Curated annotation (Swiss-Prot):
Residues 214-248 are annotated as: Disordered. Residues 38-106 form the KH type-2 domain. Part of the 30S ribosomal subunit. Forms a tight complex with proteins S10 and S14. Binds the lower part of the 30S subunit head. Binds mRNA in the 70S ribosome, positioning it for translation. The keyword Cell cycle does not apply. GO terms for cellular component: cytosolic small ribosomal subunit. This is Small ribosomal subunit protein uS3. The lineage of its organism: Bacteria, Bacillati, Actinomycetota, Actinomycetes, Mycobacteriales.
Amino acid sequence: MGQKIHPHGLRLGITSDWKTHWYADKDYANYVAEDIKIREYLEKGLDRAGIADVVIERTRDRVRVDIHTARPGIVIGRRGAEADRIRRELEKLTGKMVALNILEVKQVDANATLVAQSVAEQLVNRVAFRRAMRKAIQSAMRQPQVKGIKILLSGRLGGAEMSRTERYHEGRVPLHTLRAEIDYGTAEAHTTFGRIGIKVWIYKGDVVGGVRESELNAPAQGRGRGDRNGRPRRGGQRRQRAQQKQEG
């Protein structure tokens, strides 16, 4: 069962949350259709921005769209021009006030959707599929919160006449464990030989008592370039030695 079902759908309310937050009685079908149109518009219009996730929240007369992206500069544009254009288009699409919230994804190699998109870009650029898969797995396993990864490719791999499926994995990916935090993402590579489908599963530890193991293993925030208080300055030891010699 865990091998076939969508990992997010199986774990809704346990380790994963809904990607839309609203309630509707009579307009349920219209809201679902609007959500699909919003997601399709963002995926097609911002295909180079590395969109990892889109979360939609609705009130009576307002729609808030959270865009999780690896390249926020492309979404925002020069002086916010691109973000304003996207907001206007979404307002035309929904007929309501739209508030955009653009969030940057820090750990790109630990996000399943971004890993799948990266493999798809490499396949379009004629990189060997085994090399692309190996590179993605190595980059993901370097992240401290990643405990396992599985990548599956399906299609005319290497330009073969007959389509086939290839899979690589490293570490643990327990798809049957409900408390396991599994990140899942898909992408398509449009090559000269046809479409190649990419699926990625990333295991980031368990969720016990509402505490995510991935958050405990996440790397600490680094200091900024202007913060010099937490590190020794050059010549500090030489000054101390010179003072000791003068006192002696």
